Amino acid sequence: MGADMGFRLPRLCLPRPGIDLQRWAVVACDQYTSEPEYWAQVQQLVGDAPSTLNLIFPEVYLGKADAPQRIERIQAAMRQYLADGLLREHEGAVYVERTIDGHGGPRVRRGLMLELDLEHYDFSRTSASLIRPTEGTMIERVAPRIAVRGGAELELPHILVLIDDPAGTVIAP
């Protein structure tokens, strides 16, 4: 399904019931890259609770001397979460609604979590590929992501795909 369109239905791992979702979910690793105090506050909030914070490499820490140890801890946390049964696997898309403040009041944005076929992805500035970024890719950030993924048991992508659908034919109320 969707192979020619660059996507397919994924196998998703979601936290089991009983996990504190307020501490489980964190922003993407490429946010707050110049604010170590933000990430320190998140760590304080999370504490010892299961959290995706333990599964990502916040880019604020890129270039730090402890990067190899941080990657080892991330991969160990992935293995531990799987061994402890903290995740439940599901097949299929997940429908997402997000309320944002906009001009004229709150607005609901709708979306689907899908698996993208990276064979259709090209991050070069001149790309006309089916899947391409809307902003420049920072090449120096690619190597640490590859290092984390090298021994990773899980994938934690943080891609938001925008589609041209002014008539609301793909996702509509």
Model-derived regions, located:
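N-terminal extension/subdomain marker
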Residues: 1-172
